[in-house]
Amino acid sequence: MKKKQNLLENIVHGIFLILGLITVACVLVITVYLVVSGIPAIREIGLVDFLFGEIWASTASEPTYGILPFILTSIYGTAGAIAIGVPIGFLTAVYLAKMASSKVKAVMGQAVSMLAGIPSVGYGLVGMMGLVPGIRKVFHVPDGASLLASIIVLAIMILPSIIKMSVTALEAVPKEYEDASLALGATPEETWFRVSVPAAGSGIAAAVVLGVGRAIGEAMAVMMVAGNAANMPNSLFQSVCFLTTAVAKEMAYSSGLQRQALFSIALVLFLFIMLINAVLNFFLKGEKK
């Protein structure tokens, strides 16, 4: 009987090991494919010209492949979305975890879950039909499809991730911490923000980094509201193009060096995501220490 149990445990262990190796293999395959496909264009164009060139004209008679506008747009767009989405998401999470009644928490929790379930094209469609014309009318600009529209859409899209993960982190704080703070004379608000929030810091940091990853990797929604012009993002009302949308809009008809350059853009985006994951691990390890 014991031998059969050990055999079963070994089989289960082997299955999980294989599944884990498959996951690792997928990451390695994607990494190798992007590197192999993206490096040739960087070699031909030149790393400096590719990363810091301000003009992208892939279909011109004399093509130019500078992706600095895409890089800056992705950075500005993500930073703007985080600047708007993190405070709203964080304060909402504190309210749901510490202040809201069970009924309010259930209703708002369901609303957050529904917001998370809306597909990217849904956000993009609402932004294109409502937000873009609204920006055009309110700010009296020729076209509302802009960096500002992209930031607002991305800020809304990252809210569910930030709220859910932050609520989970705050609810995981031992109740004894709060009881001790209250016993020492602290108010509930002081306890929430000076005891519970620092104790849940690693989870909240993970939520923010996840939001950054969601924002920088989004393509469909921003493609519908950004304008998709390869301009330097010198204004919130400028029609712009992100790293993701640059690949998505041109890949279908690309060929030759243009296609290789798009893979190079994907490689740059992949490195951005890896950097974000490294930052997440740094925060988590620092919190554990």
Predicted regions and their residues:
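C-terminal transmembrane helix and the adjacent membrane-cytosol boundary/short C-terminal tail
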Residues: 167-171, 175, 182, 249-289
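Interhelical loop and adjacent transmembrane-helix boundary motif
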Residues: 222-270
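Cytoplasmic-entry segments and transmembrane alpha-helices of multi-pass inner-membrane transporters
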Residues: 13, 88-127
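Generic hydrophobic transmembrane alpha-helix motif, especially the helices
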Residues: 113-155
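Transmembrane alpha-helices
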Residues: 165-166, 188-224
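Glycine/proline-centered hinge or cleavage motifs at structural transition points of membrane proteins
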Residues: 119, 184-185, 198
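N-terminal, non-cleaved signal-anchor transmembrane helix
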Residues: 1-68, 72-75, 263-289
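Transmembrane alpha-helix signature in integral membrane proteins
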Residues: 67-95
